[in-house]
């Protein structure tokens, strides 16, 4: 099965369905609240959607406690990762290794040099202060997956704040991917949202990548 939900290709090849853990879909099916929202939206299906996503951004603003003008909506997190890279056009970027492969793939599209900070088994593959030391004036963009994919490890909030301060000092953007953070019962403890007054911080959240 190809990563990312090609269930039809799997069915055509093997004649049956598989449990696909590479796609963020629920085995419980479509929630009734979502089905209801779809039915209610059908009356406006003859119109183009609002390009500024005003209603959605207002709802997200209330739910997340973030000013509406700080929210940009896209077609999944991957879309926004590419948009950020295309807008910033970094010459050199820093990612952890291992991590979500889409960061490097997006950076490759603008010819960006990708520097990889290796997560060590001796630290249980968790990021350390050494990650901050890897940021210098040559780095334009830093990606941090919180929690990291595929290790599942979290960066301590104090470390994230220190990393952001380092990025600010060096003129780099810190992009924190929190797409899976809400799976944690204490997600609010780990989010970087309290740091959003910084112009150097971008947070990704999504229903799916």
Which sequence ranges carry the predicted segments?
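N-terminal "arm"/small-domain region of PLP-dependent enzymes with the aminotransferase-like
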Residues: 1-47
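Conserved beta-strand elements of the Class I
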Residues: 19, 72, 92-94
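Active-site pre-lysine segment of PLP-dependent enzymes
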Residues: 108, 125-138, 150-208
């Amino acid at each position: 099965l190809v990563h990312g939900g090609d269930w039809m290709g799997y069915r055509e090849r093997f004649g049956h369905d598989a449990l696909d853990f590479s796609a963020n879909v629920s085995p419980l099916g479509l929630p009734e609240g979502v089905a209801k929202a779809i039915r209610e939206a059908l009356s406006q299906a003859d119109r183009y959607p609002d390009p500024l996503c005003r209603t959605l951004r207002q709802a997200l603003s209330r739910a997340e406690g973030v000013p509406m003008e700080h929210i940009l909506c896209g077609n999944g997190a991957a879309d926004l990762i590419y948009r950020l890279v295309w807008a910033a056009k970094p010459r050199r970027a820093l990612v952890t290794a291992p991590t979500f492969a889409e960061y490097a793939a997006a950076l490759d599209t603008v010819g960006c040099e990708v520097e990889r900070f290796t997560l060590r088994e001796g630290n249980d593959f968790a990021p350390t202060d050494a990650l901050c030391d890897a940021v210098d004036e040559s780095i334009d963009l830093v990606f941090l997956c919180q929690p990291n994919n595929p290790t599942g490890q979290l960066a301590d909030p104090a470390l994230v704040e220190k990393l952001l301060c380092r990025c600010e000092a060096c003129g780099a953007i810190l992009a924190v991917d929190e797409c899976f953070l809400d799976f944690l019962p204490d997600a609010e403890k780990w989010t970087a949202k309290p740091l959003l007054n910084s112009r150097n911080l971008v947070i990704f959240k999504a229903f799916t990548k």
